[in-house]
């Protein structure tokens, strides 16, 4: 069957819901929280209208939502959930249980700033604070990537048995409508066949225990296997991304999407929706004579250090745009990028720009101002400061 996209004008949240529908998820357990709520409302609408054969489990909290997802996934079901900010934080214990149990749950997290003070706007700190739980993380630039990301996440997660977050920006994507090219169900089914679990709690001929006690003689190897699965996931991500591109014309074979790096003196590096702004600004800056490119990190976990090294070898500087902050240190992507390059001996000059916290606007004008600053840094070979809180009111 030839691929002819079904074009729908949808929000990022609706794109996530349609992707869950097309992935033929069997169980959804979730608790509503702004700005995630409309994902679950749309799925409930699919069920009420008879469009979806999904077991929906209403729960009293996000902790319970993930607990229900863990139980359902352990029976062999394809499971979906969604959350945001404080809800994700409440799930924290269960995120470890899902990853440690090697359950390929897919969750959409709508990036929202952590309270207090209360905020419902975009900020990556909620998802990045869960980076050590064992979940893979994919950051979507636009609504199309939300839809595509969910479909690819199931194929990757079910291959390596690691749960996966697809992460979108609050309101900038979650409640903003744009055209999304959806895939006919028959073609999704060809790309994403039913899950074939390694084990299930319902295989009574081969009984298993999940989450049992491991003594010091055994625990270490369990951690090692998860670490190895994340390394293996890099190959699977690239393979699945390439296959997706061949089938549907949107290539995801690179964990870091790049542009104009062939002759760039420096690049902007960041994740998520802000990279759409960066791309527009870079096009304008190139016309003005700036030798600048971009590197959009799609997958933060597993971290694509091999692709980062290739980029770092070709440029003099990297301006890291962090819509997050780790108190007592620096922006989280900045830390990861520096650490990945340290033992390679490849050391382009790097500066961390803290931008857009709590949903503060990040515009083309801002990118241009940062480009001017980074140009001076690269030309002088000296940092005036390592961390720039760009948006501070002065």
Swiss-Prot record:
It catalyses: 3-methyl-2-oxobutanoate + 2 oxidized [2Fe-2S]-[ferredoxin] + CoA = 2-methylpropanoyl-CoA + 2 reduced [2Fe-2S]-[ferredoxin] + CO2 + H(+). Keywords: Oxidoreductase. Pfam families: PFOR_II, POR_N. GO terms for biological process: organic acid metabolic process; response to oxidative stress; sulfur compound biosynthetic process. InterPro entries: PFOR_II, Pyruvate:ferred/Flavod_OxRd, Pyrv_Fd/Flavodoxin_OxRdtase_N, THDP-binding, Transketo_C/PFOR_II. Disulfide bonds: none annotated. Its EC number is 1.2.7.7. Heterotetramer of one alpha, one beta, one delta and one gamma chain. This is Ketoisovalerate oxidoreductase subunit VorA. It comes from Pyrococcus horikoshii (strain ATCC 700860 / DSM 12428 / JCM 9974 / NBRC 100139 / OT-3). The gene is vorA.
């Amino acid at each position: 069957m030839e691929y002819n996209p079904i074009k729908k004008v949808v929000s990022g949240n609706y794109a996530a819901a349609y992707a869950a529908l097309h992935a033929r998820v069997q169980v959804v357990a979730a608790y509503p929280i702004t700005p995630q709520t409309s994902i679950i409302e749309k799925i409930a609408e699919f069920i009420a209208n008879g469009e979806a054969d999904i077991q929906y489990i209403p729960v009293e909290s996000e902790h319970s939502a993930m607990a229900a997802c863990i139980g359902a996934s352990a029976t062999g079901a394809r499971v979906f959930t969604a959350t945001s900010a404080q809800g994700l934080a409440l799930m924290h214990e269960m995120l470890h249980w899902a990853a440690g149990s090697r359950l390929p749950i897919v969750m959409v997290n709508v990036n929202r700033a952590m309270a207090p003070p209360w905020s419902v706007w975009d900020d990556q700190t909620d998802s990045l604070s869960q980076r050590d739980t064992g979940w893979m993380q994919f950051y979507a630039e636009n609504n199309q990537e939300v839809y595509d990301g969910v479909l690819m996440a199931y194929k990757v997660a079910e291959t390596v048995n690691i749960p996966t977050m697809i992460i979108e920006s609050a309101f900038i994507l979650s409640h903003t409508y744009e055209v999304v090219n959806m895939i006919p169900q028959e073609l999704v089914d060809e790309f994403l066949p039913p899950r074939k679990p390694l084990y299930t709690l319902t295989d009574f001929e081969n009984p298993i225990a999940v989450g049992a006690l491991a003594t010091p003689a055994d625990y270490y190897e369990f951690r090692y296997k998860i670490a190895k699965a994340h390394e293996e996931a890099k190959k699977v991500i690239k393979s699945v991304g390439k296959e997706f591109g061949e089938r549907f014309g949107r290539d995801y074979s690179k964990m870091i999407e790049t542009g104009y790096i062939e002759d760039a003196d420096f690049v902007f590096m960041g994740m998520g929706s802000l990279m759409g702004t960066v791309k527009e600004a870079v096009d304008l800056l190139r016309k003005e004579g700036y030798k600048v490119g971009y590197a959009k990190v799609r997958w933060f976990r597993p971290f694509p250090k091999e692709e980062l090294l290739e980029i770092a070898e070709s440029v003099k500087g990297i301006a890291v745009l962090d819509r997050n902050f780790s108190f007592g240190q620096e922006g989280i992507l900045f830390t990861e990028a520096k650490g990945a390059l340290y033992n390679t001996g490849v050391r382009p000059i790097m500066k961390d720009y803290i931008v857009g916290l709590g949903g503060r606007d990040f515009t083309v004008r801002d990118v241009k101002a940062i480009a001017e600053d980074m140009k001076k840094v690269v030309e002088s070979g000296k940092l005036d400061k390592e961390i720039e809180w760009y948006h501070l009111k002065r």
